[in-house]
Amino acid sequence: DTHGLPIERAVEKELSKKKIRKESLPKTEFRKLCREYANRYVNIQKEEFIRLGVLGDWENPYLTMSPEYEATEIRELGKFFEKGLAYRSKKPVYWCIYDKTAEGQAEVEYYEKEDPSIYVKFPLKKEIEGKKAYAVIWTTTPWTLPANLGIMVKEDADYSLVEVEGEVWIVAKELLENFFKNIGKTYTRVLKDVKGRDLVGLEYEHPFVDRDELKGYLSEETLKNMWRIYPSEFVSLDTGTGLVHMAPGHGQEDYTVGKRYNLEPYAPLDDSGRFVEPAPEFIRGVRVFDANKLIIALLKEKGYLVHEARIRHSYPHCWRCKNPVIFRATPQWFIGMDIEYEGKTLSGESLEEIEKVKWIPEYGKNRIKSMVENRPDWCISRQRFWGVPITVFYCENCGEVIKDKEVFERIASLVEKHPGGTDVWFEKSPEEILPEGYKCPKCGGTSFRKEEDILDVWFDSGCSHASVIRPLGFEKADLYLEGSDQHRGWFQASLLESVGSYGEAPYRSVLTHGFIVDEQGRKMSKSLV
């Protein structure tokens, strides 16, 4: 594997010693430096593997950055477009605010993190029994509150309307005693109990966001539907209050419910995680985690903060830079797990193929099966430089995505013949890459721009069956051998890519091995710093 962010970061580090910023170089120049760096370490690792006694065809290794490999990868990608499985959409994905790129499920690791744990009361528009009424929510991500568009409840759950210091608070009946114990308060009386469905449709005011400031930024549909209580199957009564703050731009479940009720995935952040317009002025330019204390202070000042504490919990971190990631809605390319093609879905067909493979040890089957069953659509785009580009064009006139099979084949042929492989995509103009006189199939336009995102490196490695095994005359590999972390990595990426392209698993059997660890049980195959 010769592409990816670790190499970009290493090259950036070398450039910084010379006081050179990556942004000051043309993409082609930066990619050239990445290629040189990768080649240098391919040779070093090759020598080390030989010294260790590892057997391999060392004179003919396959490299994911070779023109032949990259050309095959582009053809494989073209098949997903041809079947209608690849699509572009704005929805929440893991986002590293330090590396400024989307990340996939296989690129996050969970570590303990300390965060605020706050209860906030949202004022309802209507009074209850002549008293000001509030929907009380719990969150560990105060920085997502500026993007709040709704509150979710469990339809068939019981909710208590309780009187507290002359106000009416709404909390799930099942969580009532625990909630008041947590906040160190008591309630005067229960006015009545209602079902969650009875709360649906109630409107509320945002504690610190002005509706008028969102006009011109959010759609009319969103402005009309936001700041109401909505039913959701994702609400649990394990912790919190049974009322869940919904930010469709910052959570997968929030996005699913928001889409159902025409609430757009709103996320007023830039790539480095700083708030931008139309976020409230007091947090503009502030990074998400730094904004927590400012938001909490304002809630306290306005009287909407019910209780504040700290919590240690398992939180996703970037596997490369080890910093916490966020969920952020951005336009990305996805491969759909449940899109129907030829009467099948990628998810369904992959699960069928898992049953045909021999898994050693046997627990590997259930492990990968549960991961495929529960995984979201595969986010395949990355906002970086060193990798295989997503080779589609956009019509400048109508915005149509150009994804013709013939165009993919033409690009793959150009890549195959170029010594720098996919560097040709970055060196040539759309006019030089597209067939002469090419016109947009939708509007007849003749002006195009190239997609700038690159492919997830897991798509790179997942293509090895097509780039290496099949050219040797084999339909599939007898054995894939790797560590248990690859059930969500290489084993899974290879399975999805092969099933999407050929309708079958790329391997007959999969063997999972363990790890050499240090005295604390940490894998020594990774940096221990």
From Swiss-Prot:
Monomer. It holds the Pfam family tRNA-synt_1. InterPro entries: aa-tRNA-synth_Ia, Ile-tRNA-ligase, Ile-tRNA_ligase, Rossmann-like_a/b/a_fold, Val/Leu/Ile-tRNA-synth_edit. L-isoleucyl-5'-AMP binds at residue 482. This is Isoleucine--tRNA ligase. Its EC number is 6.1.1.5. ATP binds at residue 526. Its main location: cytoplasm. It catalyses: tRNA(Ile) + L-isoleucine + ATP = L-isoleucyl-tRNA(Ile) + AMP + diphosphate. One of its GO terms (biological process) is isoleucyl-tRNA aminoacylation. IleRS has two distinct active sites: one for aminoacylation and one for editing. The misactivated valine is translocated from the active site to the editing site, which sterically excludes the correctly activated isoleucine. The single editing site contains two valyl binding pockets, one specific for each substrate (Val-AMP or Val-tRNA(Ile)). SUPFAM superfamilies: Nucleotidylyl transferase (SSF52374), ValRS/IleRS/LeuRS editing domain (SSF50677). Belongs to the class-I aminoacyl-tRNA synthetase family. IleS type 1 subfamily. GO terms for molecular function: aminoacyl-tRNA deacylase activity; ATP binding; isoleucine-tRNA ligase activity. GO terms for cellular component: cytosol. Keywords: Aminoacyl-tRNA synthetase, ATP-binding, Cytoplasm, Ligase, Nucleotide-binding, Protein biosynthesis. A motif ('KMSKS' region) lies at residues 523-527. Catalyzes the attachment of isoleucine to tRNA(Ile). As IleRS can inadvertently accommodate and process structurally similar amino acids such as valine, to avoid such errors it has two additional distinct tRNA(Ile)-dependent editing activities. One activity is designated as 'pretransfer' editing and involves the hydrolysis of activated Val-AMP. The other activity is designated 'posttransfer' editing and involves deacylation of mischarged Val-tRNA(Ile). It is found in: Cytoplasm. It comes from the Bacteria. The gene is ileS.
